[in-house]
């Protein structure tokens, strides 16, 4: 099937909407394939963790571009380096951490693709003048709107499993 003339068929390495605080770039959005999936490119510096959470509406997978990340998925620890795919099915809690010494970059796929606006809204929360309690409440409310459940109770376990001192 030929590409439609009004559809973009090449997205360059420096293209996409970049969210600087999250170091996330929207690459493939819902408008490209009617919401079937989205892809974002994400950077994660050494020592940074994305806390345990569960997606109730979409499956996710990550393709590692650079560096290494440690994933904690449903109680299992997996180390992924460049070239690896990591599958995170909906309904299974997961966290990830850069336990290495160099920045990591990865592509994150969301299937279906209605999740992309979450990142835009989360960026606004992070850059706001809210105190930590207000920010946490806003993150929980945002998660409820997008089907994300944050597991604050699993953070100590994740930190211990990752071997980091947060």
Where are these regions (language model features)?
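Short histidine-centered beta-strand/loop micro-motifs
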Residues: 28-31, 51-56, 97-99
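A hydrophobic, small-residue-rich beta->alpha segment in the mid-to-C-terminal subdomain
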Residues: 105, 116-133
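Short, conserved beta-strand element in jelly-roll/cupin
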Residues: 39-45, 54-73, 109-110
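Ligand-binding loop in jelly-roll beta-barrel domains
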Residues: 33, 70, 90-116
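Short acidic (Asp/Glu) patches
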Residues: 23-24, 47, 89-92
């Amino acid at each position: 099937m030929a590409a439609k003339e009004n559809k973009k068929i090449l997205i360059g390495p420096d293209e996409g909407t970049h969210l600087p605080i999250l170091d996330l770039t929207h690459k493939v959005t819902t408008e490209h394939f009617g919401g079937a999936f989205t892809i974002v490119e994400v950077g994660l510096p050494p020592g940074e963790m994305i806390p345990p959470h569960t997606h109730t509406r979409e499956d996710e997978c990550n393709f590692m571009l650079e560096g290494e990340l440690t994933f904690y998925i449903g109680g299992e620890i997996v180390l992924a380096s460049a070239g690896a795919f990591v599958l995170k099915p909906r309904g299974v809690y997961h966290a990830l951490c850069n336990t290495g010494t160099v920045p990591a970059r990865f592509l994150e796929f969301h299937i279906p693709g209605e999740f992309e606006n979450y990142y835009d809204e989360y960026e606004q929360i992070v850059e706001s003048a809210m105190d930590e309690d207000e920010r946490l409440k806003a993150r929980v409310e945002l998660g409820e709107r997008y089907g994300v459940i944050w597991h604050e109770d699993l953070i100590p376990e994740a930190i211990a499993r990752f071997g980091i001192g947060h």
